[in-house]
């Protein structure tokens, strides 16, 4: 664990969830990189609320904490591309741009564990792959986190504003 990514205030996975996601260390009761978990929670909630640009910013600000070649970097960079692709699709109706970003996201997410920091990465990869042929699969799709599909509240939007 790196000291610059520690944060004891970051909550553990849901206690009623029957999985231990990659990134959670049950022996220490901490996330390997708590700031990554915080960015994941915020970024997923914002994405699921349709705030794709803000979601992108959450993942991007965390991505810079990791050196290239690490799983953390690949995951964060992939999620940046996921949010940017959705932004292109929904806000600009630019499906060619979406496809380009999703193809890059799939490259980054290729070797990331299927359940990384609570995100159902397998579902993300499957949805992106399907969206390359049929962008309408994104309509109503939300990212699963800890077995749920949470949305943003005022706290997440306030955090995103502070990133700008």
Show where each model-derived region lies:
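Acidic, polar-rich N-terminal leader regions of halophilic archaeal proteins
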Residues: 1-164
């Amino acid at each position: 664990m790196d000291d610059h990514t520690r944060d004891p205030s970051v909550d553990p996975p849901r206690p009623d969830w029957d999985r231990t996601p990659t990134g959670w260390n049950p022996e220490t009761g901490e996330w390997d990189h708590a700031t990554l978990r915080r960015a994941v929670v915020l970024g997923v909630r914002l994405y699921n609320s349709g705030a794709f640009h803000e979601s992108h910013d959450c993942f991007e600000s965390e991505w810079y904490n990791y050196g290239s070649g690490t799983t953390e970097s690949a995951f964060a960079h992939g999620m940046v591309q996921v949010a940017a692709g959705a932004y292109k699709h929904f806000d600009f109706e630019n499906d060619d741009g979406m496809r380009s970003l999703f193809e890059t996201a799939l490259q980054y997410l290729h070797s990331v564990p299927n359940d990384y920091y609570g995100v159902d990465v397998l579902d993300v990869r499957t949805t992106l792959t399907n969206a390359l042929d049929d962008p309408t699969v994104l309509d109503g799709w939300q990212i699963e986190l800890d077995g749920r599909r949470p949305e943003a509240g005022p706290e997440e939007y306030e955090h995103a504003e502070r990133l700008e």
